[in-house]
A protein has these predicted regions:
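Rossmann-fold NAD(P)H-dependent dehydrogenase/reductase core
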Residues: 2-233
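Residues at helix-coil transition
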Residues: 24, 82, 279-283, 321
Length: 331
């Protein structure tokens, strides 16, 4: 058994293809696959089980993980650290922070931790996992795969009504003011875009801190824009009827044509395969930074501000309830 790959949101549209690729080409990996609902009543989790059932020699576990509760995330990480220390599972080779949340149809949602839900699920909770689990990586290093999107760049999303700009008061990323005016789609899309911008900027800071550490210098972090996935279930969850209709009658059937105007338009299977290749260092070996699909790319000018990157790094530690020292990394 060569190493453990942790994948959040493992029953997602692209994630199912990530799992399939790993099973087909890296059956020696131990997969820890997290989902919100592990019950048989969840159709998407059953699709994951069906994929796994095709490989009776696969080594895996499907585990529940509610990213909207930081207490649950901390406990999950502690359990995994203990399992690795005890030799019950192999050391980590990769963390794939795939799970995400957005809501374009209702007012701002706050978690019991007091943070806006999109920000917590997409960024804060995944930062907890990464920071708590750094010490469980192999001495040879590994890879952290984070997810951003073209929405981080002002003007690139057709759904954008409010530009994604890091607020002067960083606490507003996690605790934004009420939606004014009450345009749920505009504000929901903006919260999603800001979470992707925060992830991207945190990734740059994370890499700098990893490189300063003799213990973690061989761990590389990437933030990938996986593309606009024409068949993603995300287009049909917490989205207005207009987007759902566009997904069904325009985006999916016309994908080959739309690709001429948007080269990042592709299927979940294409994205999921690329994500798997990144996780095992087949793609872009040793690279740290931003990717569009599997192309090394330059992110938005705003995202490259190193001062703000470090400010987000410090604030994320605070939100996550973790000190740099506890993570074993320089502050």
């Amino acid at each position: 058994m060569s190493g453990t790959i942790l994948l959040t949101g493992a029953n997602g549209s692209a994630a199912l293809w990530t799992v399939r690729y790993l099973l087909q080409h890296h059956l020696d990996k131990h997969l820890i696959l997290t989902v919100r609902d592990t019950s048989d009543s969840d159709a998407n989790t059953n699709l994951l089980r069906e994929a796994l059932a095709e490989y009776p020699k696969a080594s895996f576990s499907i585990r529940p993980l509610d990213l909207s509760s930081l207490a649950v995330v901390h406990e999950f990480a502690k359990t995994l650290v203990d399992e690795v220390s005890a030799g019950k599972v192999p050391k980590l080779e990769s963390i794939i922070s795939n799970a995400f949340y957005w809501n374009l149809v209702s007012a701002i949602e706050m978690t019991n931790d007091g943070y806006e839900k999109t920000s917590q699920v997409n960024h804060i909770a995944h930062s907890v996992l990464v920071l708590r689990l750094l010490g469980s990586f192999s001495e040879n290093g590994g890879r952290i795969v984070l997810f951003t999107s073209d929405t981080h760049w002002p003007g690139k999303s057709p759904l954008e009504k409010i530009k994604p700009m890091i607020p002067a008061n960083l606490d507003e990323l996690a605790k934004p003011p009420p939606d004014e005016p009450e345009d749920h789609m505009a504000h929901g899309q903006n919260r999603y875009a800001l979470s992707k911008l925060a992830i991207l900027m945190w990734m740059y800071a994370l890499n700098r801190h990893l490189q300063k550490s003799p213990r973690f210098a061989n761990i590389t972090a990437v933030a990938i824009n996986p593309g606009n996935l024409s068949d993603s279930r995300a287009l049909r969850v917490n989205t207005p009827a207009m987007i759902q209709m566009m997904s069904k009658y325009i985006i999916r059937p016309l994908r080959p044509l739309l690709r001429f105007t948007d080269p990042t338009m592709r299927t979940s299977s294409e994205a999921g395969t690329d994500i798997a290749k990144l996780a095992v260092n087949e793609a872009c070996p040793g690279y740290r930074g931003f990717l569009t699909l599997l192309k090394e790319d330059t992110s938005s000018p705003d995202s490259l501000n190193e001062t703000v990157q470090e400010d987000i790094w410090v604030k994320t530690l605070e939100w996550a309830g973790i000190s740099a020292a506890a993570a074993g990394i320089s502050d």
